Protein backbone atom coordinates (compact mmCIF):
# COMPACT_ATOMS: atom_id res chain seq x y z
CA UNK A 1 0.00 0.00 0.00
CA UNK A 2 1.19 3.58 -0.67
CA UNK A 3 0.76 4.32 3.04
CA UNK A 4 3.41 1.70 3.87
CA UNK A 5 5.57 2.24 0.78
CA UNK A 6 7.75 4.69 2.71
CA UNK A 7 8.41 1.97 5.28
CA UNK A 8 10.32 -0.12 2.71
CA UNK A 9 13.25 2.22 3.18
Swiss-Prot record:
Keyword annotations for this protein, in alphabetical order, are:
Amidation, Neuropeptide, Secreted
The record's Gene Ontology biological-process terms are: neuropeptide signaling pathway
Coarsely, its chief localization is secreted
Residues with the modification Phenylalanine amide, per the entry, are 9
**Is-annotated flag, keyword Secreted?**
yes
GO cellular component terms given for this protein: extracellular region
Q: Which domain of life is it from?
A: Eukaryota
Question: Subcellular location, in the record's words?
Answer: Secreted
The record's function comment reads: Able to induce fluid secretion from the isolated salivary gland of Calliphora.
Similarity field: Belongs to the FARP (FMRFamide related peptide) family.
* The name this protein goes by in its record: CalliFMRFamide-2
Origin species: Calliphora vomitoria
Amino acid sequence: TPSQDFMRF
